Amino acid sequence: MIILGLETSCDETSGAVLVDGEVRSNVVSSQLCHKGFGGVVPELASREHERLIVPITEAALAEANITKKDIDVIAATAGPGLIGAVMVGLSFAQSMAWALGVPFVAVNHVEAHMFSPFIDQETAGGGPIGPFISLTVSGGHTLLAIVREDLTYRIIGRTLDDAAGEAFDKTGKMLGLPYPAGPAIDRLAKEGDAGFHRFPRALTSQSQTSRSYRDNFDFSFSGLKTSVLTWLRSQKEEFIHEHRADIAASIQDAIVGVLVEKAVGAARRHNIGAIAVAGGVSANSELRRAMDAACRKHGIALFIPSATYSTDNAAMIATLAGLKLSRGLQPLCRYDTAPFASFSAAGN
C-alpha cells in the first residue's frame, strides 16, 4: 500500500510517502518568517502553507520515485492545530484524493505524535504495538495516555494550563534567547549548572504544596513561568548575564524533572513496562538523558523517535493512517471531515 501523508498543523509544511510501512520520503519545510515576531503568526503560517503545499507534495513523490497514479491512499492532519493552517493541508489532500479517486484518511495530529516513536519499526504492516505509556510533549500539548494494543488509548493526565514546550519558549524568551527558545535553552544549558537555582515543580512529590500526587498525572507549568519571571526581575542584569547558562539549566531541570516523574510514575502505577516519548520537546537532549536513566533504573523500555520524527512531519501522519487501515479501525473515505483546533474538539 502506498500512502501519501500531508502535515500543515502549525509552521511546518510536510509531505511523506509510505510504501508498505516503509518511509520512502519525508520532506519538511520549516517556516522562518515567524522569527522576527517571536512566535508563530497564524495568518503568515496559512499563507506559507498555501505557497508550499504543492512543491512539497511534488518533492515527496519525486524522492520516493512514484507518481500520483501510484498512490493508494492520501492522509492529512485534520487537527489539532492552527485552524487556517490545518485547512490548507486538509482541503488540498481531500481535493487530491477526490481527483485521483483514492480514499482519504483524516488523522489526529496528537495521535500521530503518540505513535511516531515506532516509525521505521515495521509496525505499519500490522505488527504488535502496546501497551505503553505515551508522554506527548510539544508547544501546544502535554499529556499522558495509556495506549493499548488495539491502538485505542485513555488519557490519564494533561496540562491544566500551559504546555511544556510553551514553558521552554516563554522562559527562554525571558532570558533573551532567540526564537524558538526551547532548542536554545537546550544548547545553553549544556554549559550551566542545573543545581544553580531550584524553580518550582507543580503537582509533583517535590512541590511545596504537595499532598499526595502519586495518582495525579496532570501537569502545570504556568507557576514555573511566573516564578522565573519574578526571580529574574529581582536580579541585576549583570548577574543574569553572567549566569545565563546556569539559569537555563535550572529551568530545563525543573521542566524535565516533572515530565520524567509523571511518565515513570504512571508506568509503575499501572504496571506497564514501556514508555514512548513524542512531540517536539522529545528532541530535548536532557529529557532524553533523564528519561533513559529513569527507565533503566526501573526496568522500563523506552521509545523515543529520532530527531527527524520528533518535530511535526508527514511521515507520522502516513504511519498512523497505515496502522489504522491495516487493522480496519478507520473508514477509508472521509471527504466531509472538518478541521478542528483543539484536542478536546476531536472527541478525545
Swiss-Prot record:
It is found in: Cytoplasm. GO terms for cellular component: cytoplasm. One of its GO terms (biological process) is tRNA threonylcarbamoyladenosine modification. Its cofactor is Fe(2+). PANTHER family: TRNA N6-ADENOSINE THREONYLCARBAMOYLTRANSFERASE (PTHR11735), TRNA N6-ADENOSINE THREONYLCARBAMOYLTRANSFERASE, MITOCHONDRIAL (PTHR11735:SF6). HAMAP family: TsaD. This is tRNA N6-adenosine threonylcarbamoyltransferase. It comes from Chlorobium luteolum (strain DSM 273 / BCRC 81028 / 2530).
